[in-house]
Design a protein with these regions (language model features):
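A short hydrophobic beta-strand segment most commonly corresponding to one strand
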Residues: 99-100, 113-122
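A short, N-terminal "cap"/entry segment at the start of jelly-roll beta-barrel domains
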Residues: 1-54
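Conserved short histidine dyad/triad with adjacent acidic residue
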Residues: 48-67, 101-104
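Short, conserved beta-strand element in jelly-roll/cupin
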Residues: 57, 66-82
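Short beta-strand segments in beta-sandwich/barrel cores
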Residues: 62, 79-83, 97
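Short acidic-glycine-tyrosine-enriched beta hairpin
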Residues: 86-103
């Protein structure tokens, strides 16, 4: 059901101090972030109040921390297991996403057996 323009403005996130920008992700240098196991490689764009990233996890990657930050995460390639500290686990394949608020009741962390490539905005 379509929402009115006014309804979209009320419900949307305020992205501020981010001028129109085109990003060639292949030209963005990757930074290396070791996990508890494996490695994450981040290509990051930051402006204003947002951070957008292409993140590639090596096979066997397990995050070294439980995360409380809110994200919109979209799986571009591979398969990702998102573990919640409360014991729940969700498997996401290419074309799937999750959304989580800042300081959610159950922090999350990432694991992948085969490797994964993600697009994340936070």
């Amino acid at each position: 059901m379509p929402r009115s323009r006014a309804g979209l403005e009320e419900a949307s996130v305020r992205i501020q101090q981010v001028p129109f920008t085109v990003t060639d992700w292949s030209a963005v240098a990757a930074s290396e972030h070791p996990g508890e196991r494996g490695t994450a490689f981040w290509r990051t764009f930051e402006a204003g109040n947002i951070r957008a990233r292409i993140v590639e996890y090596s096979p066997g990657y397990l995050a070294d921390h439980w995360c409380n930050r809110g994200h919109v995460l979209y799986v571009l390639e591979g398969e990702l297991e998102t573990q919640l500290r409360d014991g729940r686990t969700f498997t996401l394949k290419a074309g799937m996403s999750y959304q989580v608020e800042d300081d959610a009741p159950a922090p999350h962390r990432s694991f992948t057996k085969t490797g994964a490539k993600l697009f994340i905005v936070d």
